[in-house]
């Protein structure tokens, strides 16, 4: 991968600044996409049953409309109040109108996106495939928080991510196209088969279909040879997180964040690192 990129002294800082701006938009995506899904289900059900829609359900609600506002006082957020991190500090973490405390998660997501975008640029340099890495990073951040909040992995995000992975690998951007296609198919099939066996033995559903599509998307980006490492690392992360959450809060752990975190780590790690791990996993010690 390194031979495809040219490291520019401006690549990392520019990508980091872009990440801050994108992170601000991802906060909107993380909040609104689940709401859009639930509103869509409600509207569909009511129309099917010939029930009237409320005024709120009839209004346009998407990633662009209505304008962002304070959830308590409903006063629209001004442009200068949307400056990543800076506006949070200037407002001292409170709404300018009603002084309601603003969640620290908003600037943290902006900062996280900026840092991860910078790391992608540092890994891949100044090249067209860096764009693919930034797109993948933005999707994974959004899916991580959406799944953690709601246990949804929206088809509107996982399915395009599969196709984007295949498109960026048409000429071997990250992995050969054949490996990308096989990775998508094997990724989906492996989790589907595992869950089918689990349900057959226990009568319970182990994970949702969204997880199958997410690992298929990661397979499309990372290739089939990365799947053993992906499953191994995500299983470790998922196991630790599930134990911690069960003990601390008594909550169930969504597996999606474990997949997204491990997928991003593998994506940005040096080839020699994850290939060594992959070899260790596929060659038993004698």
From Swiss-Prot:
Its EC number is 3.4.23.43, 2.1.1.-. It comes from the Bacteria. One of its GO terms (cellular component) is plasma membrane. The lineage of its organism: Bacteria, Pseudomonadati, Pseudomonadota, Betaproteobacteria, Neisseriales. Zinc is required for the N-terminal methylation of the mature pilin, but not for signal peptide cleavage. It is found in: Cell inner membrane. Its cofactor is Zn(2+). It catalyses: Typically cleaves a -Gly-|-Phe- bond to release an N-terminal, basic peptide of 5-8 residues from type IV prepilin, and then N-methylates the new N-terminal amino group, the methyl donor being S-adenosyl-L-methionine. Gene3D superfamilies: 1.20.120.1220. InterPro entries: Peptidase_A24A_bac, Prepilin_IV_endopep_pep, Prepilin_pept_A24_N, Prepilin_peptidase/N-MTase. It holds the Pfam family Peptidase_A24. This is Prepilin leader peptidase/N-methyltransferase. The chain crosses the membrane at residues 10-30, 102-122, 126-146, 157-177, 181-201, 224-244, 250-270. Keywords: Cell inner membrane, Cell membrane, Hydrolase, Membrane, Metal-binding, Methyltransferase, Multifunctional enzyme, Protease, S-adenosyl-L-methionine, Transferase, Transmembrane, Transmembrane helix, Zinc. Disulfide bonds: none annotated. One of its GO terms (biological process) is methylation. GO terms for molecular function: aspartic-type endopeptidase activity; metal ion binding; methyltransferase activity. It is a multi-pass membrane protein.
């Amino acid at each position: 991968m390194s031979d495809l990129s040219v490291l520019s002294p401006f690549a990392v800082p520019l990508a980091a600044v872009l990440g801050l701006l994108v992170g601000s938009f991802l906060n909107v995506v993380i909040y609104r996409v689940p709401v859009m899904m639930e509103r869509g289900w409600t509207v569909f059900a009511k129309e099917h049953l010939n029930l009237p829609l409320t005024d709120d359900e009839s209004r346009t609600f998407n990633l662009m409309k209505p304008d962002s506002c304070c959830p308590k006082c409903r006063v629209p957020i001004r442009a200068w109040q949307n400056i990543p991190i800076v506006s949070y500090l200037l407002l001292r973490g409170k709404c300018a109108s009603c002084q309601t405390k603003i969640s620290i998660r908003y600037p943290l997501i902006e900062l996280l996106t900026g840092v991860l975008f910078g790391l992608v640029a540092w890994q891949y340099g100044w090249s067209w495939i860096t764009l693919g890495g930034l797109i993948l990073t933005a999707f994974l951040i959004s899916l991580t928080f959406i799944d953690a909040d709601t246990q949804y992995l929206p088809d509107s995000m996982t399915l395009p991510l599969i196709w984007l992975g295949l498109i960026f690998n048409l000429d071997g951007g990250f992995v050969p196209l054949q490996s990308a296609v096989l990775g998508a198919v094997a990724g989906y099939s492996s989790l589907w088969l595992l869950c089918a066996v689990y349900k057959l033995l226990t009568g319970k559903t182990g994970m949702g279909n969204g997880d199958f599509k997410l690992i298929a998307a990661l397979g499309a980006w990372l290739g089939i040879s990365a799947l053993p490492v992906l499953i191994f690392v995500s299983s470790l992360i998922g196991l630790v997180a599930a134990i911690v959450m069960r003990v601390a809060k008594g909550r169930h752990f969504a597996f999606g964040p474990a997949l997204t975190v491990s997928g991003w780590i593998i994506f940005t790690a040096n080839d020699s690192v994850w290939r060594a791990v992959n070899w260790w996993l596929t060659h038993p010690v004698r």
